[in-house]
Amino acid sequence: MKRTHLHVLLVAAVVLFALNMRAGVTSIGPVLQEIQDSLHMSDAMAGFLTSLPTLIFALVGLITPMLSRRCGLHVTMLVAMVALSLGLIVRAFMGGTAGFIVFSIVALAGIAITNVLMPAFVKTHFPQRIPTFTAVYSTALTAMAFLSSIVVAPMSHSMSTGWRGAIGFWGLLALLAVIPAAIPV
């Protein structure tokens, strides 16, 4: 692969990874009532669901360095993006609370791994431009967190699949991040 193509691919990877680091979390709140009604989810379980990101980020974050050392940075990022996209897509179409929670955990594990490894990915591939690429991924992460939270309710009301299509959409975006993650560098 030509050096310029590799550079473009790595920049795309940083942006696509970052765009997927919060949408799966922030898109739930605006449609939580619809999710609860559809899945017959109790208020206690909804509270548990909304506390899962903090718990999963902490637990998976602890083991991520070990996973990265054992499997390598790129393989671990690929696994994270696959878990994230699979979790987001499948959870949207689960018929019950248990499946929804399980696949939320799968997606959150992917996000947690990405949270921990993004600084290492930037340092590995852009050692002379760490502040610039940290700003790029921080901006993309924050922008998508905002965007997903404000568009998910209108999407839910305009899609024939309702809240399921609206939250599953973010899994399709995560699939795009699998592409640069899967190309060996």
Label each residue range with its predicted role:
Residues 42-50, 134:
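Juxtamembrane helix-start elements in MFS-like secondary transporters
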Residues 26, 54-62, 145-146:
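Residue-level signature of mid-helix packing/kink "hotspots" within the transmembrane helices
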Residues 48-57, 141:
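Transmembrane alpha-helical segments of major facilitator superfamily
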Residues 59-98:
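Conserved MFS/SLC helix-loop-helix module at the cytosolic interface between two early adjacent transmembrane helices
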Residues 99, 128-129, 136-184:
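Helix-loop-helix hairpin linking two adjacent transmembrane segments in secondary transporters
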